[in-house]
Curated annotation (Swiss-Prot):
Its main location: cytoplasm. It comes from Bos taurus (Bovine). The lineage of its organism: Eukaryota, Metazoa, Chordata, Craniata, Vertebrata. This is Janus kinase and microtubule-interacting protein 1. Belongs to the JAKMIP family. GO terms for biological process: protein transport. Homodimer. Forms a complex with GABBR1 and KIF5B/kinesin-1. Interacts with JAK1 and TYK2.
Length: 626
């Protein structure tokens, strides 16, 4: 009988050992899965750090390229100024030599005239007249020949100088084109590198998502096993109830057998005593075995209840997170639409800038053609007619050029005002009336969330989800949560007030800055116009006073000045184009970051839905039992 009792007592113990081992294995699997999940989170953080490093490297390379281009432009400007200075000195020397030669010629003429006057006073009128006529004819012929040779030489020199200037201008344009091609190639290389990094990151993200899905499937399988174990615990509870009923029946039987009122015959009494002693020993063993089994079942029930409370807390937290992510997705989608619209506007502005650069290059070519056409005008035979017609043509050409420059200045000022107006309207349209602070899953933010805060808050929530909660800790948590909610409301009110004040200040500062810029540009354009008008008047005076000596000098200076103005315009347009490209690249990066966050939020929503479905499956047996 004792062996049978022992075998009966060892059977439930053997049944409970695999249940405990399965629970321990499940716990070990859950801890390993959580560790792997944390490792995957750290890998995602490292990928984000790599993206940030790639962005920093790209910005540094862009800064180096801009510095190198500015240095090359400064060197080119210095070389041009040196060449102009040397040319100016050569021209000054030639002018001084011409002035000395004309002074000598005039002195010789004065001496000759003085001699003729002396001869006339002496009384040889006819001879003097004939001699004077012959001398005058010879002198006029010699002067005409010398002037013709001098003019031909000057024409050749001017043609050579113009060829040199055109070659220098063509070299500059070629250098600018090569620089632009190098910059485009570098930009394309950077874009290819960015796309490659983006593809690698997307590949890693897909791989991580597949791993997370596999781990979700493992978690669902473990939850199913846990549901099976809860069913087994229910069976054990039913067995416990049956054993309790058997204990009650045994105790009633003991009371019935041990009552003194019952009288039995002597033979039957001895047998009853023997049977009673044996039954009493068996009942004591059964009671002890049942008490041990009941204690074990109670411990298992407590553990399962703790696990169910933890799973309920996790389910509530996940539901809360899913609602928060739904709320957070709306502003992110709206912001993505706004960024796409801004990208389209930036592309349109870049196209407009390129068209403007093409127009400026076409105007430069037209000016060159006009200069070449003006140089190929027909020469008149007489020197007086030639000087008069060239003066008139030069003045007319200068007036036309000033009018063209004035039209270009007006067009650029109108274009600038239009761009400023469109930027203001765009800024007002994009600026939200009030930036609401949203309590997101990643913290408190207006619209976007940083990656560092995302990782930190996710780690903190995971740590808080793991810890089991007692009733006293729940009370403390509720009080601390109420205090935190009050503080958060106060902080949000203060933050919104500061944000409104900052928006007002930014609007005031932006308006004054735009007005100051407009006034400054208007003053600069007026000063340029006055300077051009004064230069034209000076040129007209010089043309009237000196004739043809300073025409080609002024012509060359004017050409150099117009070329410098056009180069400055091209440089400004290139700077604006680079700025727009940088803004477009920043917008693209922000768009990619938003897409990555949307992917993360979708993954979290799917995980939350799966966990919520698993938690409902787990809670059904306990609800039935309760």
């Amino acid at each position: 009988m004792s062996k049978k009792g022992r075998s009966k007592g060892e059977k439930p113990e053997m049944e409970m050992d695999p249940v405990q081992m399965a629970n321990e294995e499940l716990r070990a699997k859950l801890t390993s899965i959580q560790i792997e999940f944390q490792q995957e989170k750290s890998k995602v953080g490292k990928l984000r750090e790599r993206l940030q490093e790639a962005k920093l490297e790209r910005e540094q390379e862009q800064r180096r390229h801009t510095a190198y281009i500015s240095e090359l432009r400064a060197k080119l400007h210095e070389e041009k100024t040196k060449e102009l200075q040397a040319l100016r000195e050569v021209l000054i020397r030639q002018h001084e030599q011409e002035a000395a030669r004309t002074a000598k010629i005039k002195e010789g003429e004065l001496q000759r005239l003085q001699a003729t006057l002396n001869v006339l006073r002496d009384g040889a009128a006819d001879k003097v007249k004939t001699a004077l006529l012959a001398d005058a004819r010879d002198e006029a012929r010699r002067a005409f020949d010398g002037e013709r040779l001098r003019l031909q030489q000057e024409i050749l020199e001017l043609k050579a100088a113009r060829k040199q200037a055109e070659e220098a201008l063509s070299n500059c344009m070629q250098a600018d084109k090569t620089k632009a091609a190098d910059l485009r190639a570098a930009y394309q290389a950077h874009q290819d590198e960015v796309h490659r990094i983006k593809r690698e990151c997307e590949r890693d993200i897909r791989r991580l998502m597949d791993e997370i899905k596999g781990k979700d499937r493992v978690i669902l399988a473990l939850e199913k096993e846990l549901g099976v174990q809860t069913g087994q615990t229910q069976k054990l509870l039913l067995q416990k109830e049956a054993l309790d009923e058997q204990l009650v029946q045994v105790r009633e039987a003991e009371r019935y057998h041990g009552s003194p009122k019952r009288e039995l015959p002597p033979g039957i009494g001895d047998m009853a005593e023997l049977m009673g002693v044996q039954d009493q020993h068996m009942d004591e063993r059964d009671v002890r075995r049942f008490q041990l089994k009941i204690a074990e079942l109670n411990s298992v029930i407590r553990k399962l209840e703790d696990r169910n409370t933890l799973l309920a807390d996790e389910r509530n937290e996940l539901l809360k997170r899913s609602r928060e992510t739904e709320v957070q997705l709306k502003p992110l989608v709206e912001k993505n639409k706004r960024m796409n619209k801004k990208n389209e506007d930036l592309l349109q502005s870049i196209q407009r800038m390129e068209e403007k650069i093409k127009n400026l290059t076409r105007e430069n070519v037209e000016m060159k053609e006009k200069l070449s056409a003006q140089a190929s005008l027909k020469r008149h035979t007489s020197l007086n007619d030639l000087s008069l017609t060239r003066d008139e043509q030069e003045i007319e050409f200068l007036r036309l050029q000033v009018l063209e420059q004035q039209h270009v200045i007006d067009d650029l000022s109108l274009e600038r005002e239009r761009l400023l107006r469109s930027r203001r309207h765009r800024g007002k349209g994009l600026k939200p009336p009030k930036k609401h602070v949203v309590e997101t899953f990643f913290g408190f933010d207006e619209e976007s969330v940083d990656s560092e805060t995302l990782s930190e808050t996710s780690c903190n929530t995971d740590r808080t989800d793991r810890a089991p909660a007692t009733p006293e800790e729940d009370l403390d948590d509720t009080t601390t949560r109420e205090e935190a909610d009050l503080r958060f409301c106060q902080l949000t009110r203060e933050y919104q007030a500061l944000q409104r004040a900052y928006a007002l200040l930014q609007e005031q500062v932006g308006g004054t800055l735009d007005a100051e810029r407009e006034a400054r540009t208007r003053e600069q354009l007026q000063a340029d116009l006055l300077r051009c008008q004064a230069k034209i008047e000076d040129l007209e005076k010089l043309l009237v006073e000196k004739g043809q000596d300073s025409k080609w000098v002024e012509e060359k200076q004017l050409l150099i000045r117009t070329n410098q103005d056009l180069l400055e315009k091209i440089y400004r347009l290139e700077m604006e184009e680079n700025q727009l490209k940088n803004e477009m690249q920043d917008a693209k990066d922000q768009n990619e970051l938003l897409e990555f966050r949307v992917l993360e939020l979708e993954v979290r929503d799917s995980i939350c839905c799966k966990l919520s479905n698993g938690a409902d499956i787990l809670f059904e047996p306990k609800l039935k039992f309760m």
